Amino acid sequence: MNQKVAGNGILKENKKNWIEISVFAALVAIASAVTFWLFYRQCVESMLGTGLYHSDMKAYILEMQGLDSGYSFPYPVLFKLAATIHLVTASFTGGAELAMALATMLLNSGAMIALKVMLDKHVGAKLQEAMPGKPWLPGILTGTAAVSLFFVSMVYPPTGIYLPGIKYKYLGVFTPNPFHNATYMAARPFAILAFFKYGELLPVYEQPNAVREHKRDYILFAIYLLLATMTKPSFTIVLVGAAGILMLWRMFRSRFRNFVPTVWLGVCFIPTFMDLLYQFRGVFVPQEGQEGGIGFTFGHVWAQYCDNLPLAIGLAIGFPILVLLLNYKELHKDSIYRFSWQGYVMSFLMAFFLYEKGFREVDFNFSWGYMYGIFFAFVGALLVLLGATANADTRKRRIVVAVQWMAYLWHLVCGVYYFWGFLQGAMYY
């Protein structure tokens, strides 16, 4: 009898896993197919110089081939992966374009898988407990949330309707998914893993023997952060800034009693610091008689693209703001959610107050860090909303949860339409 019960349990578990894996695999396959097509068109059209499917893919392809692109890309992960794939595709017509598109797609889709794993790890058990009659549903919910997050965008009105002070749909507002920038997309699997690993270490690193008990987590965090930096440093600058201020604040608050644990966690940043010094050496060297280095401003660069910053913020992170207002107590309970907002604030401050001097000023390169801040604000909000969905055991709670999902859906509908424009070759801004 016991063997029969155990056998039925195994069959149910296998069925649950089969349904969950099949649905998630189908979602990732569809997302991979459409994003690969976009990346491939960007590669082809950029090499042809048609002006359609605007991107920096031509420079990336030249960098991958070891040719002079006219730019400096001291972050090699995407280019090395594409070069490895090119060993196979070189004999094909358009093999270089195919290799770069495949590399970008693989890393972007890998980020979807990484996010799904993290959502399951941090909220999966709570969802399973709330849905005992449908054991396959929590996995489908986290999988759908993970994939859909890679298609959300800023909120924007229909064509022909203009909002006060908003000059562009994208520029000045910004999106968590800038489909025209391959290095941003490629860095996200490592950024996601580094973000969650740091969030997991925050509650424990000050404890006695934390290094000994969580040595593997320290090492993994250092590796993830270095890989993210070597793919695109924009996320790293934000995380390092937010983490540095947070760790210093904790150290001062404890009157340096946690000095040694803080140093041990700080050691994880050393490989990344060394790589950042290598990458940013060119920023501080004036070129062609122009001023170099990092300057301080008061939103001057941002103001070139937007005249209504409060509205732009609302359009970019309306969903995370709503989740925060309705679940503000989670800031005290959840270190990962709290750090998602600390990261967003740091990304905003950097974009508002800092800029690269000289010819790089108009590029507004600190906006890439801001977009990572937006992305992880969405990640944190999704974590909280999935948890709230599991706890929605009354009519009032279900209504509140539904309102938050509707806000997310609004960003998603705008994002899908924004992505559709990319597929048609439209400009990103």
Residue ranges and their predicted role:
Residues 1-41, 126-144:
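Start-transfer (signal-anchor) and selected internal transmembrane alpha helices
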Residues 24-72, 87, 359-360, 425-429:
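Extracytoplasmic loop-helix module adjacent to an early transmembrane segment
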Residues 59-102:
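Short hydrophobic/aromatic helix or loop-helix immediately within or flanking a transmembrane segment
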Residues 102-132, 147, 193:
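Transmembrane-helix motifs of polytopic, lipid-linked glycan transferases
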Residues 137-202, 308-312, 364-374:
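Membrane-interface micro-motifs in multi-pass membrane enzymes
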Residues 217-233, 239:
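Membrane-interface alpha helices of multi-pass inner-membrane proteins
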Residues 239-269:
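Perimembrane helix-loop-helix junctions
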Residues 269-276, 281-429:
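Transmembrane helical bundles and short interhelical boundary loops of multi-pass, membrane-embedded
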